[in-house]
From Swiss-Prot:
The lineage of its organism: Bacteria, Bacillati, Bacillota, Clostridia, Peptostreptococcales. This is Anhydro-N-acetylmuramic acid kinase. It comes from the Bacteria. Belongs to the anhydro-N-acetylmuramic acid kinase family. The gene is anmK. Gene3D superfamilies: 3.30.420.40. It catalyses: 1,6-anhydro-N-acetyl-beta-muramate + ATP + H2O = N-acetyl-D-muramate 6-phosphate + ADP + H(+). Pfam families: AnmK. Its EC number is 2.7.1.170. It comes from Clostridioides difficile (strain 630) (Peptoclostridium difficile).
Length: 383
């Protein structure tokens, strides 16, 4: 079968679209990446997404409208990746869309129950492409008592499991998440969780203080020095010491967090500040490794994927902290760092169509293994 996987993460750096060929399912899955693109998200749409994520700025009409706007944008990404590959869209068997997370409540509090909201209307994607769409992957895991995240460990287990190495896969998108795959393990031995901020705070600082979308190659951070007092304060965030399973997002480390931090440390040199928040991401990864992974598994190799894999300063900090572990990017290991999550949803969508379980309960904390995703049929019929 041929599929397009779509991913728009918390970093808002674009819509990732991967065209892939997939066959089999479970341990017999074979997947081949054909083409990959990242479709830029306009500043206006980014601003609308950020507003939707902030209680004081959001509104029901904004969320309602943005749900459909993103549906059209995701459709454009599907058409673009197929066009780049000279692939006729009529030959697509399905589209797997993660959507755009607007809010994520992994654990109930006050009068709010565990819940999550991803938008990017699948009916619009299905209509615009006349293709079956699998979407809304996280909600069934939450219904089963899980946190709805992380979901990529299932695909990582299928693609990366090794008989001879204990592997850790650290994705650094807006938020960081890590998957541990012990050597010669089965799916129930895999565990994963969000490590905390990834690129989200770094990008926010870069946009505010340097008028750049992101810190390309970690250039600005490389010019600064770590402010130890500030770093100690950042590392005191209660999320870091929370034991897995755990997940987080923009609602914790987004614009409100950034505003408060920049106001508190406005006296810090901007180069030192971006160096410090870059080290914060690295040290959050190290803290989680030391406290929640090392007691269970001695990791041989850490593979870094996502946009953070291109930040040379961040990679350098991680290597300094994890001296006993081989640290590589996923590209160095033979896989695309950028296409990883979009490809994961192709695999998850395929499992949905095969009526197969694809949540990893040791990662999400769900009570049961469940079939993930909602299916929106082709609007004009046919297989």
């Amino acid at each position: 079968m041929y599929s397009v996987g779509l991913m728009s993460g918390t970093s808002l750096d674009g819509i990732d679209a991967v065209l892939a060929e997939i066959s089999g399912n479970g341990r017999n899955t074979k997947v081949k990446q054909i083409e990959f693109i990242t479709l830029e998200i306009s500043k206006d749409i980014k601003d609308e997404i950020r507003k939707c994520c902030i209680e004081e700025e959001s509104s029901v009409d904004l969320i309602c409208s943005l749900n459909f706007k993103l549906g059209y944008l995701f459709s454009k990404a599907v058409k673009s990746v197929c066009h780049k590959a000279n692939f006729h869209i009529a030959n697509l068997d399905f589209i797997a869309s993660h959507g755009q997370t607007i809010f994520h409540i992994p654990r109930s509090y006050n009068n709010f129950v565990s819940s999550t909201l991803q938008i990017g209307e699948p009916a619009v994607i299905a209509y615009e492409t006349n293709t079956k769409v699998i979407s809304n992957f996280r909600v069934m895991d939450i219904a089963a008592g899980g946190e709805g995240a992380p979901l990529v460990p299932y695909s990582e287990f299928l693609l990366y499991s090794d008989k001879n190495k204990n592997l850790a896969l650290q994705n650094i998108g807006g938020i960081g998440n890590i998957t541990i795959i012990p050597k010669s393990c089965n799916i129930d031995d895999v565990f994963a969780f969000d490590t905390g901020p990834g690129n989200m705070i770094i990008d926010g600082v870069c946009q505010r203080l340097f008028n750049r979308k992101y810190d390309k190659n970690g250039y600005f951070a490389s010019k600064g020095k770590i402010n130890e007092e500030m770093l100690k304060d950042l590392m005191s965030h209660k999320y870091l010491s929370q034991a897995p399973p755990k997940s987080t997002g923009r609602e914790v480390f987004g614009q409100v967090y950034l505003d408060n931090m920049l106001n508190k440390y406005k006296h810090v040199d901007k180069y030192d500040l971006i160096a410090t928040v870059t080290m914060f991401t690295a040290k959050a990864i190290y803290y989680n490794y030391k406290n929640f992974i090392l007691p269970k598994v001695n990791v041989d190799t850490l593979l870094i994927g996502g946009g953070g894999a291109h930040n040379l300063t961040l990679i350098g900090y991680i290597k300094e902290l994890l001296l006993e572990v081989e640290v590589l990017t996923q590209d160095e290991y033979g896989y695309s760092s950028d296409a990883k999550e979009a490809l994961a949803f192709v695999i998850l969508g395929n499992e949905t169509l095969n009526n197969s379980f694809s949540n990893v309960i040791s990662a999400t904390g769900a009570k049961n293994k469940v079939i993930l995703g909602n299916i929106t049929p082709k609007p004009f019929g046919g297989k």
